[in-house]
Regions:
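N-terminal Rossmann NAD(P)H-binding glycine-rich loop of SDR-like oxidoreductase domains
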Residues: 10-28
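SDR active-site strand-loop-helix element
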Residues: 15, 38, 66-67, 104-109, ...
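Rossmann-fold cofactor-recognition segment
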Residues: 36-49
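NAD(P)H-binding glycine-rich loop region in Rossmannoid oxidoreductase-like domains
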Residues: 48-87, 98
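Catalytic helix-loop patch of NAD(P)-dependent Rossmann-fold dehydrogenases
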Residues: 84, 88-92, 99, 112-155, ...
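NAD(P)-dependent short-chain dehydrogenase/reductase
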Residues: 142-190, 196-203
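Mid/C-terminal beta-alpha module of Rossmann-like enzyme folds, strongest
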Residues: 201, 208-258
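Amphipathic terminal alpha-helices
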Residues: 280-297
Length: 297
């Protein structure tokens, strides 16, 4: 059964203008919406006063928070920055939205889970983050739900990539074009997610009259980072983005030696989101993104 939907008529504010989610939202935005995209230069959400000023400038009906601290490894040695942006700023933002009756959609991560189960995580499963980044995102979720006064909706997603910004797909393509041997972790499992597909889901979600407090969104399927890299190589080679398949070899998480611990398995159960927008296989969405990159040269 499809959720009851409504048409949004008030302006929408998207926070995090330069990130790949914001750029994906802009690329997939329906023409019927009035949307302001603000980056940190115009709206630093760590300033509660500035947030209040911006929200009072227009009669916003919805705020989408696509900003955040995303440096997973750096967060292990930075005691303040991750929590300032992912927790405290979100707490203040949710409070301001709640007081004004503005709906808030806040983006979060699969890294709030510890990866110790072997089936996709449901929205109602209890988070247990392994890293400081994951902890900062979880605290942000809790604050958004508590201070949003019933107006907050959390969207967790995983392994984001797109034609925009910095992400695994674009990094792999750059390294593959250099022809160097690459070692990629093969014992972390999850689901790659096209930010373009995420954007399409969010535009559908905002029409739901009574949304759930938490949704999970990703592409369909489960893979490892190594298999993801192999698919990037195969698809990019077929599209002419690479002259030959990349030289890839698997490596364990322990051998790779990243600063931050990551979940062994962090696939998300998206059944609750499928009634809003049916998802596609991650391999199919990957080809679409690679095709766009090929067109851009």
């Amino acid at each position: 059964m499809k959720p009851i939907v409504k048409q949004i008529v008030k302006p929408i504010l998207v926070i995090g203008r330069h990130g790949q989610v914001s750029q994906a939202l802009k690329a997939t935005q329906p023409d019927c919406y009035q949307v302001d995209y603000l980056g940190r230069e115009a709206l630093d959400i760590r300033s509660s006063l500035r947030v209040a000023q911006v929200l009072d400038q227009r009669d916003y009906g919805l705020v989408i928070n696509a900003s955040g601290y995303t440096q997973v490894d750096a967060a292990e040695t930075d005691s303040q920055a991750p929590f300032a942006l992912n927790h405290l700023a979100v707490k203040a933002l949710a409070g301001h939205c709640g007081k004004r009756g503005i709906r808030l959609i806040h983006l979060s991560s699969d890294y709030v889970f510890d990866g110790r189960q072997n089936k996709p995580y449901r929205p109602e499963d209890t988070p247990n983050p392994l890293s400081r980044y994951g902890e900062s995102k979880w605290r942000g979720e809790l604050a958004a739900l508590e201070y949003g006064q019933g107006h907050t909706c959390i969207v967790r997603t995983s392994w984001l990539y797109s034609p925009f910004g910095h992400n695994f797909v674009k990094t792999m393509l750059t390294l593959m074009c250099q022809g160097k041997p690459l070692k990629v972790v093969d014992d972390q499992w999850g689901t790659p997610t096209s930010a373009l597909a995420l954007g399409q889901f969010i535009w559908q979600l905002i029409q739901v009259i009574k949304p759930e407090p938490i949704y999970h969104w990703s592409d369909l399927g489960v893979t490892s980072w190594y298999e993801f890299a192999r698919q990037i190589s195969d698809s990019a080679n077929a599209l002419g983005l690479l002259d030959e398949p990349a030289n890839l070899s698997p490596i364990s998480t322990q051998e790779y030696g990243a600063a931050a611990p990551r979940p062994h398995y962090s696939a998300l159960d998206t059944i609750g989101s499928q009634g809003i927008l049916p998802a596609k296989r991650w391999q199919d969405n990957l080809i679409q993104v690679l095709q766009q990159l090929a067109k851009e040269g």
